[in-house]
Amino acid sequence: MAYAYRRTIHLADTDAAGVVYFAQLLHICHEAYEICLIGNGMDWSGLLREGTVALPIVHSAIDFLRPITWGDRLDIQLYPELENSRQFKISYRIFKENQDSPPESPLATALTRHVAINPRTRQRCSLPPVVETWLRNAPKIEDSKI
């Protein structure tokens, strides 16, 4: 079972055409990532205060499969995956929330790729053990189309 985050699309999330603005949906995916870390007991603020590692996004992608509009209640599923000792990715599947039946096909899919760097030198470094443990224990995506 994926990590999940629920979010309602606000008017400010949409563009002039009345659909969610592409960058805003990536922002919402990042919200889901942050909430997932907190929900899994990660002391993210402690890691940031230590100043020994940063995890910038070096690649992102998003595919819109159906319109997402103001008022839509979303169920965002996260699948973090360790790629190597310095890098991981998170695959996202965005569904319209439906509490009465299994989700339909996704409205959108997204991906973010993160690397560990030393914030002082900006050189790649190993992921902190707590992050690596979180990734190793994360749910696995059933379908690797993302």
From Swiss-Prot:
Family as reported in the entry's similarity comment:
Belongs to the 4-hydroxybenzoyl-CoA thioesterase family. DHNA-CoA hydrolase subfamily.
Organism, scientific name: Picosynechococcus sp. (strain ATCC 27264 / PCC 7002 / PR-6) (Agmenellum quadruplicatum)
Q: Where are the transmembrane segments?
A: none
Q: Which UniProt keywords apply?
A: Hydrolase
A Pfam family this chain is assigned to: 4HBT_2
**Signal peptide (UniProt feature, chain positions):** none
Quote the catalytic residue positions.
15
Give the EC number(s) listed in the UniProt record: 3.1.2.28
Molecular-function GO terms, alphabetical: 1,4-dihydroxy-2-naphthoyl-CoA thioesterase activity
On the tree of life, the source organism's domain of life is Bacteria
Protein name (database record)? 1,4-dihydroxy-2-naphthoyl-CoA hydrolase
Q: In which pathway does it act?
A: Cofactor biosynthesis; phylloquinone biosynthesis; Quinol/quinone metabolism; 1,4-dihydroxy-2-naphthoate biosynthesis; 1,4-dihydroxy-2-naphthoate from chorismate: step 7/7
An annotated GO BP? phylloquinone biosynthetic process
What task does this protein carry out?
A: Catalyzes the hydrolysis of 1,4-dihydroxy-2-naphthoyl-CoA (DHNA-CoA) to 1,4-dihydroxy-2-naphthoate (DHNA), a reaction involved in phylloquinone (vitamin K1) biosynthesis.
Catalysed reaction, written as an equation? 1,4-dihydroxy-2-naphthoyl-CoA + H2O = 1,4-dihydroxy-2-naphthoate + CoA + H(+)
